[in-house]
Curated annotation (Swiss-Prot):
Transmembrane segments: none annotated. Its EC number is 2.1.1.-, 2.1.1.35. The active site is at C315 (nucleophile), E349 (proton acceptor). This is tRNA/tmRNA (uracil-C(5))-methyltransferase. One of its GO terms (biological process) is methylation. It catalyses: uridine(54) in tRNA + S-adenosyl-L-methionine = 5-methyluridine(54) in tRNA + S-adenosyl-L-homocysteine + H(+); uridine(341) in tmRNA + S-adenosyl-L-methionine = 5-methyluridine(341) in tmRNA + S-adenosyl-L-homocysteine + H(+). S-adenosyl-L-methionine binds at Q180, Y209, N214, E230, D290. The gene is trmA. Dual-specificity methyltransferase that catalyzes the formation of 5-methyluridine at position 54 (m5U54) in all tRNAs, and that of position 341 (m5U341) in tmRNA (transfer-mRNA). NCBIfam families: trmA_only (TIGR02143).
């Protein structure tokens, strides 16, 4: 979440100075700072298309003024995206059917692969052969979308390998999954959590908002058992697949919202989706939360504050502070890390480790 409402903080030092003051009621020790390379760090990019004089341009539009900016190069985007952008644009400009009513493009990369999604205001079934030719001629994993329709050429799934403390963790996911869009920072975040856990007394882990298992797979080795929850069915399916890719057998996934999990743990409601999981068999020493920008609601806070240790990954310092007001009644902040996920922008990712008072 942006800090621009508080000032024009762009460098990590500027963000650090602000955060030190902003969270001083909860934490006065040293913050751990994690930097990113300042170019080609972002693995996801979304652009509009602008049509003029029967040709096509990449564009961005200011959300407030609606002013148009023609885009020729994205210095923050992964090198694979930058290399592919001109090839795609040249191909589209030469195919009238492909460029007609084309309004957007999404790029997604991993260390190994690249996928492309084209967005249309027309029935993509009518240009299926053109799309297939594009995929074949440019050797690209292609997804095309229009209202109520989706076509896939080659595959929509991407493979990723993260290096965590000398270990390789293998993942598969697609464009519909929530991903950390800066791979270097993602590896540093996971490693930071692993380093804290390595010196802790540990039993079982409860993880909320687990997605496709980004943290889960790397942290599982530190615990006897892991219960990880997520509401997205496709993300759960990828998480199960990623367990097999890593030969990990101590993780139990449940497709539940955090509110549903709270009801289940308090035995206020039974869920068929938990029929193969006995909650009483878990002894949670740690809970990990990586919530959306809105942060944690009261039911989740009431749930997690029962546990000895909390790891909170936050993309929004504002809601993090609000949540810490509640959590600080039972826990204290032991470690605080700042991750410069989006370099030279007011955005900041935080990691907080809390233990029971």
């Amino acid at each position: 979440m942006s800090l621009e409402n508080f000032g024009n903080f762009l460098t990590l030092d500027e963000k650090h100075s602000f955060i030190k003051k902003y969270f001083k009621e909860f934490y006065t020790k040293d913050f751990k700072l994690f930097t990113s390379k300042d170019k080609h760090y972002r693995t996801r990019a979304e652009l509009s298309f602008y049509h003029e004089n029967d040709t096509l341009f990449y564009a961005m539009f200011d959300p407030k003024s609606k002013k148009k900016y023609i885009i020729e190069y994205l210095d923050f985007a992964d090198e694979k995206i930058c290399a592919f952008m001109p090839k795609l644009l040249e191909y589209l400009r030469q195919d009238d059917k492909l460029k007609e009513k084309l309004f957007g493009v999404e790029f997604l990369t991993t260390k190994q692969e690249l996928s492309l999604t084209l967005l249309y205001h027309k029935n993509i079934e009518d240009i299926k052969s053109n799309l297939e030719n594009l995929s074949n001629n440019l050797h690209i994993n292609l997804i095309a979308r229009s209202k109520g329709k989706k076509l896939i050429f080659k595959t929509e799934n991407l493979r990723q390998t993260l290096n965590i403390q000398g270990r390789e963790i293998f993942y598969e996911f697609n464009n519909d999954c929530f991903i950390q869009p800066n791979t270097t920072i993602n590896e540093k975040m996971i490693t930071w959590v692993c380093e804290i856990l390595s010196i802790q007394k540990r039993m079982d882990l409860l993880e909320l908002y687990c997605g496709y298992g980004n943290f889960t797979l790397a942290l599982a080795q530190f615990f006897f058992k892991v219960l990880a929850t997520e509401i997205s069915k496709s993300s759960i399916n990828f998480a199960l697949k990623n367990c097999k890719l890593n030969n990990t057998t101590n993780i139990h996934f449940a497709r539940l919202s955090s509110e549903e999990l709270s009801l289940a743990i308090k035995k206020e409601r039974e869920f068929f989706r938990l029929k193969d999981i006995r909650l009483d068999d878990f002894n949670f020493s740690h809970v990990l939360v990586d919530p959306p920008r809105a942060g944690l609601d009261k039911s989740v806070i009431d749930l997690i504050k029962k546990y000895e240790n909390i790891i909170y990954i936050s993309c929004n310092p504002i809601t993090l502070k609000e949540n810490l007001k509640e959590l600080s009644l039972t826990h204290r902040v032991e470690n605080f890390a700042l991750f410069d996920q989006f370099v030279n922008t007011p955005h900041l990712e935080c990691g907080v480790f809390l233990s029971k008072v």
